[in-house]
């Protein structure tokens, strides 16, 4: 099956069966899934989070609350969370996150 892409420009939202994206008046968000992953991205206040989940039980939840870009990528069985307040978390399978809101990241090979 083809990847699902949920983009949201300022003031917009987008939803498909495995992804959601929502942006406030000053946010940009993107969620992309394939092969059983789930992803959500929510942005405001000049934040630009991107969530990419590929593979069975891959999950990424991104929240942009401060100015800056953030990315979270999860492979099969991995869970990535970026909340914009604390450092990102990467658990389970192979995953990566980088967050310019907190200047922190995580990596799980």
Label each residue range with its predicted role.
Residues 18, 26-28, 36-38, 48-50, ...:
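Detector for repetitive beta-architecture
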Residues 32-34, 44, 52-54, 63, ...:
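Feature marks extracellular polysaccharide-active and adherence modules
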Residues 1-16, 59-109:
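Long terminal segments
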Residues 6-14, 29-34, 50-53:
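Short, solvent-exposed secondary-structure boundary motifs
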């Amino acid at each position: 099956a083809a990847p699902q892409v949920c983009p949201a420009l300022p003031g917009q939202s987008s939803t498909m069966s495995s992804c959601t994206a929502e942006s406030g008046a000053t946010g940009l968000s993107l969620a992309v899934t394939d092969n059983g992953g789930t992803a959500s991205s929510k942005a405001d206040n000049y934040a630009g989070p991107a969530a990419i989940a590929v593979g069975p039980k891959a999950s990424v939840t991104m929240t942009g609350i401060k100015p800056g870009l953030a990315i979270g990528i999860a492979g099969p069985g991995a869970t990535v969370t970026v909340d914009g307040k604390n450092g990102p978390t990467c658990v389970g399978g192979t995953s990566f996150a980088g967050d310019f809101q907190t200047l922190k990241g995580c990596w799980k090979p």
